[in-house]
Amino acid sequence: MKTLLLTLLVVTIVCLDLGYTLECHNQQSSQAPTTTGCSGGETNCYKKSWRDHRGYRIERGCGCPSVKKGIEINCCTTDRCNN
């Protein structure tokens, strides 16, 4: 009986994927693509873009931060969706 309960617990953990971590791109502007695993149960990736004296800038990462006027932000919820 204990073996059956332990087996059911393991199957439940595997099926629910309790250890899932969202993966987001985190490269800046025109750098080569890189990714990072988000921490703290983060459920969003973002891509923030703006223009300044250096030209068109892009920032990517985990979360969905608030931005100032003139900065465009796109937030999404699937792995590597912010490229």
From Swiss-Prot:
Task: Report the principal subcellular site.
Answer: secreted
Q: Which UniProt keywords apply?
A: Acetylcholine receptor inhibiting toxin, Disulfide bond, Ion channel impairing toxin, Neurotoxin, Postsynaptic neurotoxin, Secreted, Signal, Toxin
GO molecular function (one): toxin activity
Where in the body, by tissue, does this protein show up? Expressed by the venom gland.
* Compartment list: Secreted
What the entry lists under CDD domains is as follows: TFP_snake_toxin
Instruction: Please explain the role this protein plays, according to its UniProt record.
Output: Binds to muscle nicotinic acetylcholine receptor (nAChR) and inhibit acetylcholine from binding to the receptor, thereby impairing neuromuscular transmission.
**Family that this chain belongs to:** Belongs to the three-finger toxin family. Short-chain subfamily. Type I alpha-neurotoxin sub-subfamily.
What is the protein's given name?
A: Alpha-neurotoxin NTX-2
